[in-house]
UniProtKB/Swiss-Prot annotation:
It comes from Saccharolobus solfataricus (strain ATCC 35092 / DSM 1617 / JCM 11322 / P2). Thermostable. It catalyses: An aryl dialkyl phosphate + H2O = dialkyl phosphate + an aryl alcohol. This is Aryldialkylphosphatase. Its EC number is 3.1.8.1. SUPFAM superfamilies: Metallo-dependent hydrolases. PANTHER family: PHOSPHOTRIESTERASE-RELATED (PTHR10819), PHOSPHOTRIESTERASE-RELATED PROTEIN (PTHR10819:SF3). Its cofactor is Co(2+); Fe cation. It comes from the Archaea. Inactivated by EDTA and o-phenanthroline. The keyword Ubl conjugation does not apply.
Amino acid sequence: MRIPLVGKDSIESKDIGFTLIHEHLRVFSEAVRQQWPHLYNEDEEFRNAVNEVKRAMQFGVKTIVDPTVMGLGRDIRFMEKVVKATGINLVAGTGIYIYIDLPFYFLNRSIDEIADLFIHDIKEGIQGTLNKAGFVKIAADEPGITKDVEKVIRAAAIANKETKVPIITHSNAHNNTGLEQQRILTEEGVDPGKILIGHLGDTDNIDYIKKIADKGSFIGLDRYGLDLFLPVDKRNETTLRLIKDGYSDKIMISHDYCCTIDWGTAKPEYKPKLAPRWSITLIFEDTIPFLKRNGVNEEVIATIFKENPKKFFS
């Protein structure tokens, strides 16, 4: 299966190379930006994205998967500009990011109608361009699987069955939303191997993470540096334990880094306390060296960062 890239020709999955599976070039509140654009500086956002992508590329990153969809400020033209300036392989997605309710537009609209929007992005292109989505992104968090969240999950399943693109999720690792996402998607006929349950690295509950992997899905240990959810050292120990227990073929590691984000909790003055080491290169500076010191060889590193993304998109 070929993987569509932003601003470039598609590639075969075997050519994906070293991949960061969950990073954001930019995240913003769509309604706020539309109404008060003076709060934002796109030139600065662009510089931030270009600089961070180039830093990642210095460590050998070939492909970045950016799960910024509706609700997070997806802007395919901004993504194109960053690709042109850096040369990175960038995979964009479709989907809807909500925790509770869908926007009013979706009142009295069906699951099939939501799925049609996802399928449009996958088959026709995103936001009036020829850039096609390579995956579907869905979310569930502390409120659990609400009625509208479930509609989006089932719509993602329809899109997967129609187009064969995989599904990446945002989950809360402390309330079983990942297991519920997996259950609903597989109930709808999605191959569990085409599901990546995100943010499982926010817990060191090994048994919970293994339950998801044992059902056939990939496990996202993908928030390295977000110490407010779990410190880096505990994330490293969890990752090492999973590798030692034979789960390297299910693991994907990333940072969920946002080159720019406008959320109030991400104000610069909060970062030293909540996420002092959060960056797009932390895993190269800390995690991979830690794993190697503890006996993890290059073959396993390649499995996690190259082979698993290849399988996921195949």
